[in-house]
Amino acid sequence: MHREVQRYIAVIKNPLVILYRLLTGMACYYDATNWSERPFFNTRGTRNKCVVINPENNIDYYFKTSMLKEGKNYKPEFWSEIIASEVGRSLGFNVLEYNIAKHGSDVGCLSQSMNSDEESLTEGIGLLTGYDNTYNPNDKTSYSAYTFDFIRKALEYFQWGEYIDDIIKIVIFDSIIGNSDRHQENWGFITTLNPIAREGNKTLVNKLASLLRIKKNDVKEIEVTIKLIPMQGRFAPIYDSGCCLAREKSDEDVTKLLRDSLMFDSYINRGKSEIRWGERGEKLNHFALIKEIRKAYKETVDNEIRRIIEVFNPNNIREIIFNIDIALPDDLKASYALSEERKELIYRLIINRFNRLKEVLL
C-alpha cells in the first residue's frame, strides 16, 4: 500500500491525535507499550532504540530514549530531539517529525519510518565508504577525514552532486540548535531499487567475488557500491538531531548558564560541528564552518539564511519550547516534564544562535 494512503488511513483511525496536532501544532503523546516490537532489528547510534509497529496502520516507528549510561545521564535528550524537530519544521526545514511516547516503563521520542517497504534509507556512511573504501569512521585515524569536501566528492562520485545544497542546509540548521553530532549515519537518502536489478546485482557481485577471489567479508562493501550507482533517490528528512540544546547539562549547570552571561557565551563558542573542514579535518564552530562554506557557495548560504530570517519569529519559538510537554500525561510530568529554567535556557540558546547566524551575512 502506498505510504500516503497508509498515512490517510492512520488519520481516520486515530483522529484525536491528529486533530490535537492540527489545533495546537504541538508534539503529540503516544502510548506504544502494546505495539509489537520488531525482533532482530538493529538501529545505529548511541541511544537506546527499538522499532515498533503501529497496529493502526502497520507502519514501523522508531522509539528512542535519552542517553543513560555511566558518566552520561542525558535525561532531557529526547526532548531536544522533539524541540529541534518542531523548531526546524516551523522554520521551513525538512525535518522528520518526532512525538512524545511511552514504551513499557520508558519515555522517549517516536518517529514514523521515513521509507516505504519499497524503499530503504541509505545513510551517508554508505556513500562515503563506497567512494573511499579506506575510510573507516570507527578508526580514530579516520576522524579527520570526515570533512565537507569529502562529503561533496562522495556525492559527486555517485552523481548526486546537486544534493550538496541539502548538506549545507543541514549545517545551517545545526548551527541554530547547536547540534554537535551530525556524523555519517545522521544524514542520508531514501532510495528505491528495482527487485530484479537488486537480484541481478547480487549475482554479479558473487561472480566477481569468485573470479577475483575476494574475501567474503569484502563482498558486502562491493555490493553496496554497485547498488548505489543506478539507484534513484531523494534526500532524507533531517533526523537524529538530539545532541543539542544543552541536553547534557545538569539542572545546576542550567541555572549557572542562565545567570552567567560569560559562561553562556563560552558554551556557545565551544560548540562545534561534527562535519570538519580543510585538509587537516579541523573541527570548527558552526558559524565559522558556514563562513568557510560560503566562500564557495555564497548564493546557497545567503539564500537559505535570508529565508530563515523571513520566517523566524521569537514568539513562535518560545511558544513551541514552553508548550513542548503539554501533551505529557500528568502522571509522567513529575519525572519527565522539562523545568521552566531549562526551557528558558533552550529558548535563549536558539535566539542567540539565530542572531549569530544572521551575522554570517555581514
Label each PLM-derived region with a short phrase.
Residues 183:
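Canonical protein kinase catalytic loop motif
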Residues 17-134:
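Conserved ATP-binding subdomain of kinase catalytic cores across diverse folds
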Residues 187-189:
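Hydrophobic residue at the +6 position relative to the catalytic HRD Asp in the kinase catalytic loop
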Residues 180:
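Glycine-rich phosphate-binding P-loop
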Residues 76, 194-362:
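C-terminal catalytic region of ATP-dependent kinase domains
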Residues 114-171, 198-206, 210-217:
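ATP-dependent phospho-/nucleotidyl transfer catalytic cores
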Residues 2, 6-8:
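Low-complexity, intrinsically disordered or signal/transmembrane-proximal segments
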